[in-house]
Amino acid sequence: MIYGIGTDICDVRRIRASLARHGDRFAEKVLADGELATWRARSARWPERGVRYLATRFSAKEAFSKAIGLGLHMPMTWRHCEVANLPSGQPTIVLHGALQDWFAARGLRCHLSVTDESDYAASFCVVEKD
């Protein structure tokens, strides 16, 4: 049974401007530790790739927060929600802390799709209840 659906579109230019204004602090606020390491590595090789990586993660977390119906209210926090990839490359949500407990207690599972183009990153999330 579908518990919730969320979608988000993110303007990559706004993410670029936030990084220019706030530097690494912006990424450190939005990304979980594993994501932060990937972002730093991608940004070092090709800064634009780092910006797009951050934009897709931002968009995916927004879509997920809408699908679970919490928005950005506890226990949903940026850093407790991590976007990872399965070996196949499929994006998935990995939860931590109180958010992981909240999600598991409700018997929920998530399906996520992300995409990006030059100026936009978009995500679609479906959360199901067992």
Swiss-Prot record:
Pfam families: ACPS. InterPro entries: 4-PPantetheinyl_Trfase_dom, 4-PPantetheinyl_Trfase_dom_sf, ACPS, Ppantetheine-prot_Trfase_dom. It is an enzyme of class 2 (transferase). Keywords: Cytoplasm, Fatty acid biosynthesis, Fatty acid metabolism, Lipid biosynthesis, Lipid metabolism, Magnesium, Metal-binding, Transferase. GO terms for molecular function: holo-[acyl-carrier-protein] synthase activity; magnesium ion binding. It is found in: Cytoplasm. Its cofactor is Mg(2+). GO terms for biological process: fatty acid biosynthetic process. Mg(2+) binds at D8, E62. It catalyses: apo-[ACP] + CoA = holo-[ACP] + adenosine 3',5'-bisphosphate + H(+). Its EC number is 2.7.8.7. Coiled coil: none annotated. One of its GO terms (cellular component) is cytoplasm. It comes from the Bacteria. Belongs to the P-Pant transferase superfamily. AcpS family. Transfers the 4'-phosphopantetheine moiety from coenzyme A to a Ser of acyl-carrier-protein. This is Holo-[acyl-carrier-protein] synthase. The gene is acpS.
